């Protein structure tokens, strides 16, 4: 359970942006970097599905997919000359205004532990 909780924490935008931001990168490169990092984290944690209920695993996968969609959506609203900092700001704005809440996902997973 610890690894899946860490995965969820690590893919929340307010967690991965400070960890990965290279302000001067073009936003397109940063977009790819973020998506690749999330996919690598997910692949590393694939075996965790053995320890979770089908519902908890599905919620985790959906959260990952929705975060990637959010990143792509934020990127489409960036002007061509935007930087990684611009994209990071847009991602956080989208995340704050969205229904995606990592804490809700964590509650579902933690409920299984108890």
Predicted feature locations:
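Conserved non-transmembrane functional hotspots
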Residues: 1-114
């Amino acid at each position: 359970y610890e690894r899946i909780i860490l995965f969820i924490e690590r893919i929340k935008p307010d967690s991965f942006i400070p960890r990965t931001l290279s302000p001067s990168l073009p936003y397109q490169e940063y977009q790819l970097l973020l998506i690749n990092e999330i996919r690598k984290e997910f692949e590393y944690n694939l075996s965790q599905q053995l320890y979770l209920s089908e519902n908890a695993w599905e919620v985790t996968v959906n959260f990952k997919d929705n975060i990637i969609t959010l990143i792509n959506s934020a990127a489409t609203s960036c002007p061509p000359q935007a930087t990684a900092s611009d994209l990071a700001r847009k991602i956080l704005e989208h995340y704050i205004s969205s229904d995606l809440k990592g804490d809700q996902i964590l509650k579902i997973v933690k409920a299984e532990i108890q």
